[in-house]
Every structure is written in C-alpha cells, then in structure tokens.
C-alpha cells in the first residue's frame, strides 16, 4: 500500500536513533517491538496440570502424561519417580519438588507441564506456578500433619492442600474426589469448572453435581463413565 521495500534485516538494531533522534519526535519502537512479539491480552501460558494428594498422585501424573504424549505434544513430567522431558528420563529420583517443577516450566521445549506436588513441598516452598489449567486433588489425610512446622490439625492441613485448587484458572478445571469429604469442600474455592470423580455410583455429591449441570466421572470395575448433567 505504501510501495515500501525491505532493504535490510538487522538482528541487533540500535534503537537509540529512534528513541533520541537528532531532530523530530522520538518514536516508541521498543514498545512496538514488544507488542508485536507479545500482543496485549494474548495468553502465553502453556497448559499446567497440577496433582496433589496423600496417595495415588504419582500413577495419576504418569497416566496423564502418557495420554498427553499420545496427542504428539512435548510433555514435561515432574513426579516422585523422576523428571521426564518427552520420553526421556532426566532424573530418576524424587522430583515432586518446587525446584524440579520450576525446571520443567523453564524448559522452552515443554508444551504441557504435568507436575506432582507433595504436601510437605507445598507447605515449605509453595507451588512453582501461579495458575494452572487443571488442578487435581485426590485425597487428604487429616492426620497427616507436620508438627515440626506447627501444623497440628486438619484445618491447617486443609489450608495447605487447597492451594492446588486456589490457583485453577477461570477457564480451567478442578478435578476433585467426591468420596473424600475434605476434598469436596474445595469445590467452592475453584475459579473454574469442577469435575468430581467417584467409585460410588450412588454418591450424593455426584447426584447433586449432575443436577446442577456439572460433569462427573464414575469409576467402575470394568468401565469409566463420564456424565454431564443427565447425559452419560
């Protein structure tokens, strides 16, 4: 439209001539470059899936990572069995820690991060991410306290575990165990959608959730059923 042509591509241009010209008005070229690379309002987060619970969280993290790999995305997995980038094992020690989770998030090749969080690490270091797309809470043992850190009762334990649901994005999902009363209480803390799962086909929590047009997963002996409202 302007009959212009590209005469040079400079990998390291000097912006000083535009910001402080010898004559004329300064131009905000730095801001324009940043806006071009990172448009205002755009979402640059990769999907993060956080899993916590007193037991069962490692196989759940591994299963989620496996299914994601089947979709041909590069998965970063940080769990108690090790640190994995794609199909490669980087470490074979317990990496369900803040440091390992952060390492996963800093890997530029990772397209989806699956992070297992143990309760002690959550207490001492917190979560390695500020928000996540999916937060999974499997179970809570109210007797699993940490007296060395002045955590004595179930309310304090609840406050630790709830952080996994506190950080779920409004566009995300909190996946909660309908068979654990303490976990059920976390539903109201989730900014996003809540999906309950249960092994009890007669679960009152599931029934109420479905009546409110929610989604739920029922785990049977030979099948897994996803229900949405009154649909199955």
Enumerate the predicted regions with their spans.
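Short polybasic amphipathic segments
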Residues: 81-89, 215-230
């Amino acid at each position: 439209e302007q009959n212009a042509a590209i005469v040079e591509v400079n990998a390291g241009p000097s912006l000083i001539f535009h910001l402080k010209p010898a004559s004329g008005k300064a131009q905000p070229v730095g801001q324009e470059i940043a806006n071009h690379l990172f448009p205002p309002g755009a979402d640059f987060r990769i999907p993060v899936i956080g899993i916590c619970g007193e037991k069962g969280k490692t196989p759940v993290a591994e299963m989620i990572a496996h299914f994601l790999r089947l979709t041909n995305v590069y998965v970063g997995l940080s769990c108690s069995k090790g640190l994995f980038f794609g199909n490669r094992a980087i470490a074979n020690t317990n990496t369900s820690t803040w440091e390992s989770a952060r390492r996963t998030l800093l890997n530029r090749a990772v397209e989806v991060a699956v992070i297992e969080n143990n309760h002690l690490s959550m207490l001492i270091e917190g979560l390695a991410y500020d928000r996540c797309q999916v937060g999974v809470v499997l179970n809570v043992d109210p007797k699993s306290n940490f007296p060395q850190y002045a955590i004595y009762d179930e309310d304090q334990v609840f406050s630790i575990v709830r952080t996994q649901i506190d950080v779920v994005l409004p566009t995300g999902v909190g996946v909660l165990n309908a068979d654990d009363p303490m976990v059920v209480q976390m539903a109201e803390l989730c900014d996003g959608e809540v999906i309950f799962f249960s092994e009890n086909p007669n679960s009152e929590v599931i029934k109420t959730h479905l009546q409110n047009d929610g989604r739920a997963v029922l785990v049977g002996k030979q099948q897994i059923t996803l229900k949405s409202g009154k649909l199955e």
